[in-house]
Amino acid sequence: MSLRINDIAPNFTAKTTQGEIDFHNWIGDSWAVLFSHPKDFTPVCTTELGYMAKIEPEFTKRNAKLIGLSIDPVENHAKWAADIEETQGAAVNYPMIGDTDLAVAKLYNMLPAEEPGTSEGRTAATNATVRSVFIVGPDKKIKLTLTYPMTTGRNFDEILRVLDSIQLTAKHRVATPVNWKQGDDVIIAGSVSDDEAKTIYPEGWKAPKPYLRIVKQPK
């Protein structure tokens, strides 16, 4: 069964480049970004993990932890990290899971479809994960899922933007419009009546339509 937003993120234990972890305990009171890549020592993955290393401080500012995953053993991850630093100019400073038995990949549906049949008999020797992303909240619930094909590198600035939106809307009864970024105007949630909105936003709001109430981003 596929995982959906608001499902509890399945817990697991796994070997990583920073030691064995229990996923829920590792998250603690933080947010988490779990992302898979197809294979170590491959070009697109090298650019992705290098860029994530560069922007990791931005996630830390937001109380969010990063953790990567592929079917490769942690020993390969450690060797590959040197190539990433050399070519991308950033040292991988977050743990990477060595999911050699595909346990986490199957748990999080990170494997591509197989025609015909299913993924039941797959082994790490013959399979690779697609480019999946899961944002998990401190409540251990899934807040976002994204899946990219193996041939397309992800836009991790977009993951950061979505995290900003998720954290903002968890705190305030607002929604973020198309192409929103930190500091832009937001939309008052439909669940907030006009009377409630007058109390929350005494300065008022713009409303080109009654259902489209635009206000400055709350602090």
Predicted feature residues:
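Chalcogenol-based redox active-site neighborhoods
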Residues: 1-219
